[in-house]
Amino acid sequence: MTEFVVAIPARYAASRLPGKPLRLLGGEPLVLHVARRALQAGAGEVWVATDDQRIADALSGLAEVKVAMTAASHASGTDRLAECARIAGWADDTVVVNLQGDEPFAPAAGIRAVAEALVGGNAPMSTLATTVEDAHTLFDPNVVKLVRNVRNEAMYFSRAPIAWHRDGFARSRDTLPAGHNWLRHIGIYGYRAGFLQQFAAMPPGQLEQVESLEQLRVLEAGFPISVAISPEPFPPGIDTPEDLERAEVLLQAMAAR
């Protein structure tokens, strides 16, 4: 199995759900669920990169998880993880998986797939995708879509429906035309630790700013991103109070199995 570490960015001041890492799910802080998922995936190290002591305190019961106290001024989770990598002292070739702090149901196989996508290829960065199941999802700008080349590398990420099925969508946009599998991006990433520092130092790209998608910075700079298909369903993350309510229902359903 590929050796890897997991870093979880956990910022307290989330705009749509303030204090998100400490919101309770099943009676426990959200960040605790995410950290356990990383441990279950077999990570050699699990770090939480945060700017708030309350989040660090919430993790005190998990001895296997380390906490990096990072600057509150970081503009993105990538910047926060780059500081975490420096604190942890990881070698440049270390495989680092960036597991978002709002993914309490991230499957272990999906986390491992991101790490494995970096091994044996030329891409310094990897991510996950899954199949789009319906037209509503494809046309939703809050759902990021992507297209891959024959090497399973990302060609582009967009909030728009890509690829555009000219004839099929001319007939109807209510159903997906047959004969093409659209891909939905899952926001989990893998990097070599050295490239993580390089990524964080890059200036924002024009496409990144237009789409508000940080990963486009890497493509614009000419670097490939390997895209693996998630081997298991990857439930959506938590961004809003409504998402948290749905997660509570899902957690109860999983416990009842």
From Swiss-Prot:
Species name: Stenotrophomonas maltophilia (strain R551-3)
Q: Name one Pfam family in it.
A: CTP_transf_3
Q: What class of enzyme is it?
A: transferase
Q: What exactly does this protein do?
A: Activates KDO (a required 8-carbon sugar) for incorporation into bacterial lipopolysaccharide in Gram-negative bacteria.
Q: What is the protein's name according to its record?
A: 3-deoxy-manno-octulosonate cytidylyltransferase
**Membrane-spanning segments:** none
Query: Per its record, what are the GO molecular function terms?
Result: 3-deoxy-manno-octulosonate cytidylyltransferase activity
Q: Which reaction does it catalyse?
A: 3-deoxy-alpha-D-manno-oct-2-ulosonate + CTP = CMP-3-deoxy-beta-D-manno-octulosonate + diphosphate
EC numbers: 2.7.7.38
SUPFAM superfamilies per the UniProt record, alphabetical: Nucleotide-diphospho-sugar transferases (SSF53448)
Q: From the UniProt record, list the coiled-coil ranges.
A: none
Major location category of this protein: cytoplasm
Q: Recite the lineage of the species.
A: Bacteria, Pseudomonadati, Pseudomonadota, Gammaproteobacteria, Lysobacterales
InterPro entries from the xrefs?
Cytidylyl_trans, KdsB, Nucleotide-diphossugar_trans
Q: Which NCBIfam families match?
A: kdsB, PRK05450.1-5
Alphabetical list of Gene3D superfamilies matching this protein: Spore Coat Polysaccharide Biosynthesis Protein SpsA, Chain A (3.90.550.10)
Q: Where is the protein situated, by its record's location annotation? A: Cytoplasm
